[in-house]
Amino acid sequence: MKKTILSWMLLMGSTISMNAAVNVNRIEPTDWYVGMKDASLQLMVYGKDIKNADVTVDYPGVRVDSLVRLDSPNYLLVYLNLDGVKAGEMTLNFKQGKQSKKVKYLLKNREMAGDKRIGFSNEDVLYMLMPDRFANGNPKNDAFKTMRDKTCDRTAPSLRHGGDLEGIRQHLDYFNQLGVTALWFTPVLENDSPNDGKNSTYHGYATTNYYRVDPRFGTNDEYKKLITEAHQKGLKVVMDMIFNHCGFEHPWVADMPTMDWFNCPEWLSPEYQTPEHQKKIGTMDGAATVNDKFQQTSYKLTPVLDPYASKIDMHETVDGWFVPSMPDLNQRNPHVIKYLIQNSEWWIETAGIDGIRMDTYPYADRDAMAHWMKVLGEEYPHFNTVGETWVTEPAYTAAWQKDSKLSEKNSYLPTVMDFAFFDRINSAKNEETDDWWNGMNRIYNVLCYDYLYPNPKSVMAFIENHDTDRFLGEGKDTLALKQALSLLLTINRTPQLYYGTEVLMNGTKSVTDGNVRKDFPGGWADDKHSAFTAEGRTNAENQMFNWLSRLLHWRQGNEVITKGKQTQFCTQKGVYVVARQYKGKSVMIVINGKNEANELNVARYAEIIGNAEKATDVTNGRTVLINKNVKLRPRQAMILEF
């Protein structure tokens, strides 16, 4: 009798399962584009017990190549072939037992062919900003009761302050006035993570939805509108992405699609999903208190290229989590990297971005990232991506650039970040220049290694960013700042500025990261001081803004700087000179690295000056006679054009 009852219960359970409604809660990508070189489309279907559904498609030319049933019962990967398919609305037919469901899915035409998309280059100057800290154009989206972090508090340096995309859009003319040509925002995608009272994910580096702009920044449509209007004003937009990790509140974490979706997934196993451990995970500094199964990255990037690297060092670098609240994605899983590749393509097609900045580039799997770059390069041959490669040695950085002879593997990464220049210029600012090692010798020496780079002009140089101390520290040394900017904007590099440099924003990380990510003055309606207008800026701010703006506008379209041959001279008596030459035109950057008055011995630079008798100092418009020695003020920077 008991056996009969048990059999009946099992039969009824099976029948109920077979007749249960088909649940399709979400499909990613949310829509797609026809005419891509890679005709394969991965659809990640989310829904309770969707794993065993069968799928057919009603649409001319679309073929279901495969259904991949993952470990979790709540995911199904549908691989479609769209070769030769035209745009339109197709129907996806899901069937489970006797139940079925039809879901409409839109296939769109592309706005332009991939080879028509032109990325940022060394002709641009990128202006990096943090949306939460730049301007609040819509106070109504500062906080939402439906999100885990409901706080907006400008008095707390590491909580959300309310800046948004609308605030950026309202100040597009400001960027034109300044003279920059491209904007790089820190990530704008949804970060639906809690705050612990001290820290939050206002920075955007803990993604919880790869297809949705964070509502506190705006909507997908507002992001597209911002980019469209930026393009109308001659500004490019670079999107910050993260393939290395996601946020802990991403649905993948609570319900892993496969057991190898993340690196070191042991910490996500059920026995560690207790309120106590959740609390530890939610704290940004939780690494010191978590259980021994947690593996944090060593932050040591050298093992990735080290020919003698141990397996344990590689594991700690690549597989360890960046912080406890950011689970480390396993790009070696082919379904993970396919998802991420499609996501980057979707944002290019949907929003019209002009470039990608990839966060924590070497922390992700090297081969998978190279595959992504190769695919993206084939689809968008003139697009540009810059990778964050935070090691201060040129040999390391150069090995990550596309076609490098220093690596046995091609990364296909067009642009790398120049942490070597950043490191040297921040040391030089505190030193007087001698004839060997200190001061501007650091810049001379680091540029000597440009022979290591396949393409030096596609190396992104900077003097500060959101992860470093401000160049000014806690001070206001404008002489050192002008020297650094004079070099940054004229050497054979792609230059990047950090918001607020033009109005002397300062700060160090010794206080908190938020101290180098302060709100831009005037970005909030109740600000008493606005740096967006000449009337609102102080005299010191206007002097710096005007000086930099003059230089930025001069750089626009200047082929001597973007195409010219570069020549540098060993320092002599504290003077450092770099020259650029193109089609009979010359520019000499002259840096007095001494704290006292000095002199430029023009005879030493005859190979550049030739028969020229006078030049224009771009920094102030004055005429300078160069047929005789030139007097230099303490720590002066001159940019001589002739």
Segment roles from a protein language model:
Residues M1-R26:
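Bacterial Sec-dependent N-terminal signal peptides
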Residues A20, K98-K102, L106-V125, N176, ...:
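Carbohydrate-interacting/catalytic domains
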Residues A21-K51, N109:
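Beta-strand/beta-sandwich contexts
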Residues K37-G97:
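Immunoglobulin-like IPT/TIG beta-sandwich domains and homologous Ig-like subdomains
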Residues Y127, L183-F185, V237-M239, I356, ...:
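Hydrophobic faces of well-ordered beta-strands that scaffold small-molecule active sites
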Residues A135-E345, T350, M369-E378, T389, ...:
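Substrate-binding/active-site clefts of carbohydrate-active enzymes
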Residues H245, N343-E345, E349-P454, K476-T478, ...:
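Active-site-proximal helices and loops of the catalytic beta/alpha 8
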Residues P456-K476:
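Active-site clefts of carbohydrate-active enzymes
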